[in-house]
Amino acid sequence: NVEEFINRFKDRANAVKDRPMPPIGGDERMQFMKQAELDYQDYMIISDSEFEVTDEYLIFKYKLDN
């Protein structure tokens, strides 16, 4: 079910956004924060996309000026 798939990505995006910072500092902290931002962005792109099934392919469409 594609709707459930999309909802799981929304849940993942929210989980990344709300995930607590582990007790790390310096470069590791910056790397963790950067990865969290990328994870959130990736999950939101999928969850905000329109989709269609064409010739047995699941196709996501994301408007770039979102």
Stretches found by the model and what they are:
Residues 1-66:
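Compositionally biased, non-globular sequence tracts
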